[in-house]
Amino acid sequence: MANVVDQSKEQMKKSVESTKENFAGIRTGRANPALLNGIVVEYYGAPTPLKHVATIGVPEPRTLSVTPFDPSQANAVEKALRDSDLGASPRRNGSAILLTMPELTEDRRKEYVKLAKSKAEDGKVAVRNIRRKSKEAIDKAVKDGEMGEDEGDRLLKELDKVTKATTDELDALLEAKQKEIMEV
């Protein structure tokens, strides 16, 4: 039954990783290749993620460089970047497409902080759901006589400790992301 706590710990780690990935997609003052993760390009008629059709680099702190593997598809890549909601206008530089990220306004920064809080809360909800399911499994095992009450209480305390550590980690990630967003 201690296996339940280990499984919960693994699921909670995945929740933290998912939250980190969500945070990577939130814009800050600096250019970050993860900002382009959600962009899909019409590549030979099929919708394809941008990272599968081009290399993405950061030549300057506020500039992303996108170089399509197939130069004949540069127009499709440029169109996908133009249609995205990044707020940056792509410009051609030979076979590369440069995206200069505009400075964030104070209002836009606050919107991104709100979005980060929402993503962190989603992570916490997932952690609480994992805890609830594990607690139900432990309570059922105690009720069915598969383990004693003392063992059940010990596992619940261990589960609470893991849950608290995970939510604290999510809070720390949120605080760091907020600081990064508000940095001018």
Swiss-Prot record:
One of its GO terms (molecular function) is ribosomal large subunit binding. One of its GO terms (biological process) is translational termination. Keywords: Cytoplasm, Protein biosynthesis. It comes from the Bacteria. It is found in: Cytoplasm. GO terms for cellular component: cytoplasm. Transmembrane segments: none annotated. InterPro entries: Ribosome_recyc_fac, Ribosome_recyc_fac_dom, RRF_sf. The keyword Transmembrane does not apply. Its main location: cytoplasm. It holds the Pfam family RRF. Responsible for the release of ribosomes from messenger RNA at the termination of protein biosynthesis. May increase the efficiency of translation by recycling ribosomes from one round of translation to another. Belongs to the RRF family. PANTHER family: MITOCHONDRIAL RIBOSOME RECYCLING FACTOR PSEUDO 1 (PTHR20982:SF3), RIBOSOME RECYCLING FACTOR (PTHR20982). This is Ribosome-recycling factor. It comes from Bifidobacterium animalis subsp. lactis (strain AD011).
